[in-house]
Amino acid sequence: MYVSTVEKKCLIVKLTEKVEDLSFINTLFSENCHHLILNLQEIELTNATLLSKFTTFGKKLVGTNSFVMVSTQFINKEWNIVPTLKEAFDIIELEDIERQLNF
């Protein structure tokens, strides 16, 4: 179903099968985690509605911190979907800088 790790104050959840309910991530997110990366590379994305639902969940969970999805099938800057994990960390770093500068 999923694999999770914490790296650089980011909870990284890699889905290994398609799910619609991400509420299980609430139990994985801790005070050691400021940001959430949802890795969707191993699942087939078939509709934008599901991605919109994931975005709403992720942004609500992290509050003012960063939420990024990783997928090579559906890249969308508006929803912070990038093709690699490295780019996800880059987005988080840029957003941290913007927050520090009050952008």
Describe these PLM feature segments.
Residues 2-6, 12-103:
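Amphipathic, Lys/Arg-enriched alpha-helical "gate/interface" segment within cytosolic domains
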